């Protein structure tokens, strides 16, 4: 197949598997609705400096990630595609970086293509590409910073070296504006030991200053602007989002130190069977500069994230590009040698996982059905399992010819699985679809009330309003609600009837509740019995008409 044919086929696959599904399912709570609402508020209100969630100060992240999601909504509309396109673009750019870095390291087109394809089809990378959060963007900036570092170190001219270090600084600056100080730490974790090993520490000191200057030029304008606007921003952001999350006893998402070790293997699916041979080859080539650089990039950030108390699966996404390159390099070496053992093992693993998934689905459907009168969704999930099994079988039977078969498994999974979700999951996790069904009833509401931040942000995004009052909940908006001018934005359980009486004198009130527990049912029971009610799964929408004083 010619290069033009390969590129055309990959572009078609990108559109079919990555772009088309973006508009086919609602926004998942809590992340997608939160980021959609924050960025929409920037777009509508014009405040591009201080992040606000539901009109309240929200200082958990800087602003660049919100800017990109807002840009997507500005260009493509305030819709599902517009909210998610930033993640797809960031992922596509990271795939391009994988290709370019592999080409620079090994100067072999086949290896470059294999590395890019593996990275694009890693389960965690492909799955997050259609999900509106900040991790794909942050991962791109970290990837760019370290690719720029290698280009600077491998440069043959002073001009190219200067460009590489400058690009490193710019990428660190944008990474910082996306997710914070980690964007500075991760490149240092790799650059410092590598350049000491290379005995190039003077170059690190000299050109590193240029990178720091470039990063500061990117960061300082916003850093000073947000400090002038919100004097408490940096205290909260540094201590709450960095120190407490890394070392605090009450850190969010606390996990054991070994949490990321099995997750790393799972993140590589459907290529996890190649992991042992890739690591073994990396050990044999441990004195080669490219392998040392990639190993440091993989292992040192992984160790840092493992030491942190707060852990989420997406935190290790910056570790996956070097792993894809090590695996792609090992894969092509085995193809050239005609060694099919690892490929057969990978195919057998995927086939086994597909059969296990099929058996689990059959068991659940017989004992406690996951899909109830949902033949289309059940057909889609069977199609996903079938594609995974077919890819595994093909790679097992014809490992040297069908080495790329796992691409099909991964891409069919990300394209169809969101649409294959059971209705009870969709109803619970994507409340914006329920809100969209009742826009006519909601448009005239004077006040909005919700007992759940995910539902509240879905309501706010669909109605293009930030003034949703919180009903007996605070969550991650506890800090924003602590400001005196916003104390009335949350109503405790004991005051709800009085609040509703006063609010209904101004106009109608729309109440969106998620009912997941006995306390939620009690919240629903406290609402007046008049007005219209609509229910979908565990979501209840009550439209309470205006009352006279």
Swiss-Prot record:
Catalyzes the transfer of the L-Ara4N moiety of the glycolipid undecaprenyl phosphate-alpha-L-Ara4N to lipid A. The modified arabinose is attached to lipid A and is required for resistance to polymyxin and cationic antimicrobial peptides. Keywords: Cell inner membrane, Cell membrane, Glycosyltransferase, Lipid A biosynthesis, Lipid biosynthesis, Lipid metabolism, Lipopolysaccharide biosynthesis, Membrane, Transferase, Transmembrane, Transmembrane helix. It is found in: Cell inner membrane. Disulfide bonds: none annotated. It catalyses: 4-amino-4-deoxy-alpha-L-arabinopyranosyl di-trans,octa-cis-undecaprenyl phosphate + lipid IVA = lipid IIA + di-trans,octa-cis-undecaprenyl phosphate. The keyword Transmembrane applies. It comes from Pseudomonas aeruginosa (strain LESB58). Belongs to the glycosyltransferase 83 family. Its main location: membrane. One of its GO terms (biological process) is lipid A biosynthetic process. Pathway: Lipopolysaccharide metabolism; 4-amino-4-deoxy-beta-L-arabinose-lipid A biosynthesis. This is Undecaprenyl phosphate-alpha-4-amino-4-deoxy-L-arabinose arabinosyl transferase.
């Amino acid at each position: 197949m010619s290069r033009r044919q390969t590129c055309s086929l990959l572009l078609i696959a990108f559109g079919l598997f990555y772009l088309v599904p973006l508009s086919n399912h609602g926004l998942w709570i809590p992340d997608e609705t939160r980021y959609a609402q924050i960025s929409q508020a920037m777009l509508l209100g014009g405040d591009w400096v201080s992040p606000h969630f539901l009109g309240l100060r929200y200082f958990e992240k800087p602003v660049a990630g919100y800017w990109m999601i807002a840009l997507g909504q500005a260009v493509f509309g305030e819709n599902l595609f517009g909210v998610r396109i930033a993640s797809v673009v960031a992922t596509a750019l990271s795939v391009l970086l994988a290709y370019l870095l592999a080409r620079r390291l090994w100067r072999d087109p086949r290896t470059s293509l294999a590395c890019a394809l593996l990275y694009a089809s890693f389960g965690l990378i492909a799955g997050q590409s259609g999900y509106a959060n900040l991790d794909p963007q942050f991962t791109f900036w970290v990837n760019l910073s370290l690719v720029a570092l290698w280009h600077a170190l491998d440069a043959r001219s002073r001009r190219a070296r200067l460009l590489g270090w400058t690009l490193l600084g710019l990428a660190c600056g944008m990474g910082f504006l996306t997710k914070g100080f980690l964007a500075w730490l991760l490149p240092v974790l790799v650059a410092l030991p590598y350049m000491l090993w290379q005995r190039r520490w003077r170059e690190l000191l000299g050109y590193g200053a240029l990178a720091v200057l470039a990063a500061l030029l990117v960061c300082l304008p916003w850093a000073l602007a947000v400090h002038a606007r919100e004097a408490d921003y940096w205290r909260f952001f540094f201590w709450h989002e960095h120190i407490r999350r890394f070392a605090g006893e009450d850190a969010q998402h606390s996990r054991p130190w070994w949490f990321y070790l099995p997750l790393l293997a799972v993140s590589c699916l459907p290529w996890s069977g190649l992991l042992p041979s890739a690591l073994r080859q990396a050990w044999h080539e441990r004195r080669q500069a490219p392998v040392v650089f990639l190993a440091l990039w993989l292992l040192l950030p992984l160790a840092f994230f493992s030491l942190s108390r707060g852990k989420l699966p997406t935190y290790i996404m910056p570790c996956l590009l070097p792993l894809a390159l090590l695996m792609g390099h090992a894969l092509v070496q085995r193809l050239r040698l005609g060694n099919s053992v690892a490929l057969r093992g990978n195919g057998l693993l995927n086939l086994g996982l597909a059969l296990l998934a099929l058996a689990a689905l059959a068991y659940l459907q017989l004992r406690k059905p996951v899909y109830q009168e949902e033949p289309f969704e059940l057909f889609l999930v069977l199609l996903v399992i079938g594609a995974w099994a077919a890819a595994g079988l093909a790679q097992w039977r014809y490992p040297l010819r069908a080495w790329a078969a796992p691409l099909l498994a991964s891409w069919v999974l990300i394209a169809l699985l969101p649409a294959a979700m059971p209705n009870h999951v969709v109803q619970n996790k994507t409340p914006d679809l329920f809100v969209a069904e009742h826009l006519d009833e909601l448009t005239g509401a004077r006040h909005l009330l919700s007992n759940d931040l995910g539902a509240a942000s879905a309501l706010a995004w669909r109605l293009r309003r930030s003034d949703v009052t919180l009903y007996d909940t605070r969550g991650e908006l506890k800090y924003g609600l602590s400001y005196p001018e916003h104390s009335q934005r949350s109503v405790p359980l004991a005051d709800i009837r009085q609040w509703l009486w006063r609010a209904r004198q101004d106009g109608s009130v729309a109440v969106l509740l998620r009912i997941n527990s006995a306390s939620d049912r009690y919240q629903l029971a406290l609402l007046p019995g008049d007005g219209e009610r609509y229910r979908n799964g565990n979501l209840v929408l009550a439209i309470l008409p205006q009352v006279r004083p």
